[in-house]
Amino acid sequence: MIYKVFYQETKDRSPRRESTRSLYLEVEADNELEGRIKARKLVEENTDYNIEFIELLSDKHLEYEKESGTFQVTEF
C-alpha cells in the first residue's frame, strides 16, 4: 500500500497551508487503518515533522501522482 503523508517540516510553528509538504511511503499492512498507524510511526521515528494527514492512494490516484513527475517513495 502506498500512503501520501502531508506534513509541516517543524513542530515549532503553527501549520500553514502554503508550507505543507508531502512524501510517499510504501507500507505493508492488512488494512488501511493499520497502514496509517505504521506510516505515522515511521515518520515520527525518523523525522521531526508535524504530520497533518495520511492518505491511502487508490490505483488511479497513484497513477496520477506518478505522471505528475514528483512521485518518489521515501525510505527510512
Curated annotation (Swiss-Prot):
GO biological process: DNA-templated transcription
A Gene Ontology cellular-component term: DNA-directed RNA polymerase complex
InterPro entries: RpoY
Signal peptide: none
Protein keywords: DNA-directed RNA polymerase, Nucleotidyltransferase, Transcription, Transferase
Known EC number: 2.7.7.6
GO molecular function: DNA binding; DNA-directed RNA polymerase activity
Chemical reaction(s) catalysed: RNA(n) + a ribonucleoside 5'-triphosphate = RNA(n+1) + diphosphate
Assembly, per entry: RNAP is composed of a core of 2 alpha, a beta and a beta' subunit. The core is associated with a delta subunit, and at least one of epsilon or omega. When a sigma factor is associated with the core the holoenzyme is formed, which can initiate transcription.
Family as reported in the entry's similarity comment: Belongs to the RNA polymerase subunit epsilon family.
Function of the molecule: A non-essential component of RNA polymerase (RNAP).
The protein, known as: DNA-directed RNA polymerase subunit epsilon
